[in-house]
């Protein structure tokens, strides 16, 4: 009897070989991140602004320091001037010049103001009545002044307007030798701005100068320094 052979078809499903279906386009390759580098010009703008700001601050500080220094220096000058004042009373005039830093110009009481100076004339009844030229200069110096110095006709006319015609007054002009005239203030002697009487100066032995009135009017005359005369003192106005 012939044996029967049964054949069976066996299919083994290999999942590893199973097909995979993708939908859509293939995935694009991943891009590398890019670094955003700042341009040099973008950094220059804030740096320049910072430098300008620092410069403005420096200038402001410098200006403030200069103003403070000027004010402080002015304060020290005023303090020194007030400390050096030997006069108890002052007559002051308010300055009207807009550019004038100090607002008051002062002269001691009983002194006459003219221009930028104050003038004091000795009287017969005053403490400093009549004295030699050197004594007169010392008297003026003790009051913070010196003997009169004249550099213009306007000043000469002002002085003669407050003097007594019957008196003579020493001024701060003297002969240092060989007709070398000098002012006590050390300002230059200008021969073209002098007011000598006619024929004066007349003697090498007369080395000091007075201002007096003759028939021809007011003028200068040289006399011996030891003679006793009245005098005129002069000082700069006190600025407050």
Curated annotation (Swiss-Prot):
GO terms for biological process: adaptive immune response; antifungal innate immune response; antigen processing and presentation of exogenous peptide antigen via MHC class I; CD8-positive, alpha-beta T cell activation; defense response to fungus; detection of yeast; innate immune response; negative regulation of cytokine production. Glycans are attached at residue 190. Coiled coil: none annotated. Ca(2+) 2 binds at residues 200, 202, 206, 221-222. PROSITE patterns: C_TYPE_LECTIN_1 (PS00615), C_TYPE_LECTIN_2 (PS50041). Ca(2+) 1 binds at residues 149, 155. A motif (ITIM motif) lies at residues 5-10. Residues 18-38 are annotated as: Disordered. C-type lectin receptor that binds carbohydrates mannose and fucose but also weakly interacts with N-acetylglucosamine (GlcNAc) in a Ca(2+)-dependent manner. Involved in regulating immune reactivity. Once triggered by antigen, it is internalized by clathrin-dependent endocytosis and delivers its antigenic cargo into the antigen presentation pathway resulting in cross-priming of CD8(+) T cells. This cross-presentation and cross-priming are enhanced by TLR7 and TLR8 agonists with increased expansion of the CD8(+) T cells, high production of IFNG and TNF with reduced levels of IL4, IL5 and IL13. May interact with PTPN6 via its ITIM site. This is C-type lectin domain family 4 member A. It comes from Rattus norvegicus. The lineage of its organism: Eukaryota, Metazoa, Chordata, Craniata, Vertebrata.
